[in-house]
Swiss-Prot record:
SUPFAM superfamilies: Ribosomal protein L16p/L10e. Testis-specific component of the ribosome, which is required for the transition from prophase to metaphase in male meiosis I. Compensates for the inactivated X-linked RPL10 paralog during spermatogenesis. The ribosome is a large ribonucleoprotein complex responsible for the synthesis of proteins in the cell. The small ribosomal subunit (SSU) binds messenger RNAs (mRNAs) and translates the encoded message by selecting cognate aminoacyl-transfer RNA (tRNA) molecules. It comes from Macaca fascicularis (Crab-eating macaque). One of its GO terms (molecular function) is structural constituent of ribosome. This is Large ribosomal subunit protein uL16-like. It is found in: Cytoplasm. It comes from the Eukaryota. The lineage of its organism: Eukaryota, Metazoa, Chordata, Craniata, Vertebrata. Component of the 60S large ribosomal subunit (LSU). The gene is RPL10L. Belongs to the universal ribosomal protein uL16 family. It holds the Pfam family Ribosomal_L16.
Length: 214
């Protein structure tokens, strides 16, 4: 018996059911890589960030996440180059879905119990997504804006329901607005740290502040 179609598991009907010592024998998720492209690019190299945002409360299968990841990555590599972007899948498939297998061969009614003891066996994993939750993000250079929108548009076709494409006002994957970011770095309120930044608050020991601004 093959894999049941993902439309059967589209809606969030049950409570979250993660893999645990009570829920064993769960098959591995299809998606294993969540960060692609130039992951080690410094925070100031990729100021533009585009998000794919869910417009429905639903479940997305790990197979769909993997298909969308491959689709967006292929387009971005072709249009911006292998080192011209950093893509991150923001959902992780932790919710386990079950299947109550039914036999359809001759004499099956003698072998199976129907809906008696119908709690199924683990079949796969899905990610539960809320309205307004980010599914995928891509950071890149400002001139690649149209390519980001097109890559996310193509990836949208791999998912059920509605999604929106949103170009963020923030700088890259940080939580700081792009128009304030460079001023804050110049004033040493932000210290670049990999693909993120460290925020330096205006309170604390004076000695630390003096060392930073010396």
């Amino acid at each position: 018996m093959g894999r049941r179609p993902a439309r059967c598991y589209r809606y969030c009907k049950n409570k979250p059911y993660p893999k645990s010592r009570f829920c064993r024998g769960v098959p591995d998720a299809k998606i294993r890589i969540f960060d692609l492209g130039r992951k080690k690019a410094k925070v100031d190299e990729f100021p533009l960030c585009g998000h794919m945002v869910s417009d429905e409360y639903e479940q997305l299968s790990s197979e769909a996440l993997e298909a969308a990841r491959i689709c967006a990555n292929k387009y971005m590599v072709k249009s911006c180059g292998r080192d011209g972007f950093h893509m991150r899948v923001r959902l992780h498939p932790f919710h386990v879905i079950r299947i109550n297998k039914m036999l359809s061969c001759a004499g099956a009614d003698r072998l199976q119990t129907g809906m008696r003891g119908a709690f199924g066996k683990p079949q796969g994993t899905v990610a539960r997504v809320h309205i307004g939750q980010v599914i995928m993000s891509i950071r890149t250079k400002l001139q690649n804006k149209e390519h980001v929108i097109e890559a996310l548009r193509r990836a949208k076709f791999k998912f059920p329901g509605r999604q929106k494409i949103h170009i963020s006002k923030k700088w890259g994957f940080t939580k700081f607005n792009a128009d304030e970011f460079e001023d804050m770095v110049a004033k040493k309120r932000l210290i670049p740290d990999g693909c993120g930044v460290k925020y330096v608050p205006s309170h604390g020991p004076l000695d630390k502040w003096r060392v930073l601004h010396s």
